[in-house]
From Swiss-Prot:
Lineage summary: Eukaryota, Fungi, Dikarya, Ascomycota, Pezizomycotina
GO BP term, example: conidium formation
Gene that specifies this protein: stuA
GO cellular component: nucleus
Provenance organism: Penicillium rubens (strain ATCC 28089 / DSM 1075 / NRRL 1951 / Wisconsin 54-1255)
Start-end of DNA-binding region: 354-375
SUPFAM superfamilies membership: DNA-binding domain of Mlu1-box binding protein MBP1 (SSF54616)
Comp. bias (Polar residues): 137-157, 469-487, 504-515, 523-540, 586-596, 654-695, 723-734, 745-762
Regions of compositional bias (Low complexity) in chain numbering: 110-128
Protein name: Cell pattern formation-associated protein stuA
Family affiliation: Belongs to the EFG1/PHD1/stuA family.
Amino acid sequence: MCSTIVNDLDDYCASLNSSFSKSLYCASHDGRHLRRPLLASSLYSKPFIRATEKLELPSISQVHTRGPADIPWYNPHAAERPLLPGDKLPALSLPTATQGLSRTAYPDPSVTNSTNSSARTSLSSASVPVNEPRSPPSSADLSGTQGRLSLDSSAPTEYSLPPSVNEGYYPSPTSLGSMNQTQPYMDVHSHMSSAQSYAPQGATAGAMSQYQYHGQPPVMQPASSYAPAAYPQYGYPTGVTSPPTGHPPSSMGGQMPAQLLPLPGKLQSQNVIEDYSDRYQVSNHAVAPPSGYGNSTGAPLQGFVFDGTGQVAPPGAKPRVTATLWEDEGSLCYQVEAKGVCVARREDNHMINGTKLLNVAGMTRGRRDGILKSEKLRHVVKIGPMHLKGVWIPFERALEFANKEKITDLLYPLFVHNIGGLLYHPANQTRTNMVVQESQQRRLEGPPPGPQRTPSGSQQGPIHHHHPSLQTPMSSHMSQGPMNGQPGSRPGLERANTFPTPPASASSMMNQGSSYEWGGQVPHTQPLSIDTTLSNQRSMPTTPATTPPGNNMQGLPAYQGQGYDSSKPYYSAAPQTHAQYAPHTPLTQSGMSSYGQPLAGGYMKSEMAPPNPRPGVSEPETSERDSNRYSQSNGPGETVAEHDQEYMQDHNAGYNSNRGSYTYTTNPSVSSLTGEHSQLTPEMTSSPSQQNGSGRMTPRTGAGPPPHWASGYNTPPRPAATTLYNAVSDTRGTPANGASDPYSMASTTAPVYPTGNGSLSAGSKRMREDDDIRAESTAEYETSKRRKTITDATLGGPVGGPPILQPMKPSGVMARHR
């Protein structure tokens, strides 16, 4: 096959006047490379032929890679060597002093026609690979010497270590030429005393260093680029020239296996490696464990004497220690990672996390826990970072366990007495000292008071929860205790006092871009809504940076005028709705929160327990108060003849629209209440009434006096919410402040006067009872209440509709008595 190829090449290569290209082609063909790339490489390298005459080395490397199967091909070509001089490639006599390689010509008996008697060259001295571009060796050398040398297992050991082998020149023809290369290579190295097969050893980055001239000029690369294609399995990342360290062991290792990294005891070639160590970062150690630790497998390395004290670093091990400050314990912790497990050792008492230590040994959980439980002296840590949790045992016991499980070398330098000296590496000595000093200082000072440390942890959690809302324009949500209803907000005010709310001092941070960005996002016009009560009662210590503004926050009162969040479109737009609320500046800040903030339903305060079925109990509020609530919707004292009219006036229309969606059966009654509630503290109203875009209170919110509302709540949903509202408002409105009844809350829907509604009637009855309970409820009032009918609407009772809810009395008097 080769011969036919050569014949084909004759015409093509005639211009080349050398069998060099032919031999290349054959080699390339053997290497399963395309002819064109090889020729290109040979041509490409030609210009350098005259430039330098150091090309012989590459031929040697390729020789090694060649497999015995290639011998027949090369031998015939060896005869053609004489042509090479025409190529101006001097015979092997060319070794240049600069190469630093002394070549000894070894007559090669296998080649009879070799003009180059020095088929083999021994590299007497390890020399750093020359970076100068090397022209390809003469074809005679290439074909003849390579073939003989690579195939000759008896080749002197020198071949195994050609320091400046440029595979790049002929990667495809020779180095990659045969898959068998490793086998001949092993033969070549067989004289080496290492028993291990070289292929595995080649895996080490160091092994490849000699052959891989990552420092080589790009000249080699063109040829090398072809090589990878030929043998993808080698997976040369960048071709032969790529840095040795980067190559997976398999890449070059298959071709030039272990020669580079002698076994620990076999250092024949180590001098070469050392020479290259600077360039290739090959460790001077005979063995360079890939992991950087002497023993990543748990089995002692060859030539490594197990050290039970943990003071001696295993071969090739690099101390990897990190230190962190364990705030909870006030101690510095040294951490060493082994097998993906972080084992920590305290600096103060040198106790070691036995749980993690035994995890490194791969011990089962049951056995591990049993061993640790039997320890007399132990410290159990159940909170904190995962790598610090577990059972801490004394240093001596930990060392015993490590020795018993044979993981002491894996854990190096965990047991080194002066582990602090290894911390971070001398380059960072200053930082190391700083860390150690800080830990010592803290230990001397004693652990910081809990509050100082915890604020960042416990305190921040809640704060962060608020933050989403804080960052939103709704400043009211930000801090108000009432906000509890909101999903992330803190609990109700009653609990807020004990909650880790931000310290009052934090208020100074308001406008600063504190970590929470309190001030920046809250409109200043609307002071942060954090209740002053909260700020005053902060349970947490003052932690300026992280805590939300506290006392500085202007009281919610400022909000009252503004309809909770002016920023909220529906709030600002709804001021009228809010008007019901806002007008009651009397509302406590919390009260405001109930309006401005759409309190989440969850927010309901315990106080907000559903309105008592017996509305009368809390109802004792004066009718005036009721009037205020109602008056909000329509001006106080202003009677609304029609439900619809009231709604329209109140901007309730929006409310009504929301009402439609409102399914609160109790809401109908509640809505009227909402007006009242403006006075109520949000805790009272903490219902999510805000859910209505209008900002109306939800039934509970509205249910300021739970009793009245309770009737509404308890009663089954009224078929017509409006009726409920009417009934409620009627009840409300009729009380002494009937005029204030502007309880416009009555739904805009035409009052359905389901006098027949049992549920409505029941609700109305409750309402009546509530009214009776009212201090103001006089006999006349009650009678008027019962007498209320649709006609009452003219009186301007809240929407007049409410009376409809009232069951018609047999004596039903059409006119309402005011």
